[in-house]
Amino acid sequence: EITTFAALTERFNLPNGNYQRPKLLYCSNGGHFLRILPDGKVDGTRDRSDPYIQLQFYAESVGEVYIKSLETGQYLAMDSDGRLYASQSPSEECLFLERLEENHYNTYKSKMHADKDWFVGIKKNGKTKLGSRTHFGQKAILFLPLPV
């Protein structure tokens, strides 16, 4: 017996998404949480109680997100050299393509540098990885969004 369902014909006018609850981005490479510091520096820390690791995600469109520090109010950004930094206001450098991979980890690719495949990445020592040094398949680019 086959059950069929009617196609959904309603349209929903929803505002640009905000993932409601803050998240932590846990990197599988070295066990670091992505941290956005007040001085504009971005790195990783293993300290789960660090206030600078609480992040708010905002969807610009499907699969495109801004990542903002709850503590500093700054946005994660990647410059033209592939360096991660904190920006005071959202810009093109702050948009990332969020993708759920087959291994259930998320990756965040710079939209501005999508043609170069530059990802957000954290090295085992907690320092950020240059976008130009990242590529698909590296543990440094795999993140688990966790509840605060």
UniProtKB/Swiss-Prot annotation:
One GO process term, biological-process aspect: cell differentiation
Residue stretches spanning the membrane: none
Name of protein: Fibroblast growth factor 1
Encoding gene (name): fgf1
Pfam families named among the record's database cross-references: FGF (PF00167)
Residue ranges of the propeptide: 1-11
Region of interest (Heparin-binding), residue spans: 123-139
Sorted UniProt keywords: Angiogenesis, Cytoplasm, Developmental protein, Differentiation, Growth factor, Heparin-binding, Mitogen, Nucleus, Secreted
Species this chain originates from: Cynops pyrrhogaster
Function: Plays an important role in the regulation of cell survival, cell division, angiogenesis, cell differentiation and cell migration. Functions as a potent mitogen in vitro. Acts as a ligand for FGFR1 and integrins. Binds to FGFR1 in the presence of heparin leading to FGFR1 dimerization and activation via sequential autophosphorylation on tyrosine residues which act as docking sites for interacting proteins, leading to the activation of several signaling cascades. Binds to integrins.
Family indicated by similarity: Belongs to the heparin-binding growth factors family.
Main location: secreted
Positions with a binding annotation for heparin: N29
GO cellular component: cell cortex; cytosol; extracellular region; extracellular space; nucleus
Taxonomic lineage of the native organism: Eukaryota, Metazoa, Chordata, Craniata, Vertebrata
Record-linked PROSITE patterns: HBGF_FGF
Annotated compartments: Secreted; Cytoplasm; Cytoplasm, Cell cortex; Cytoplasm, Cytosol
One annotated GO molecular function: heparin binding
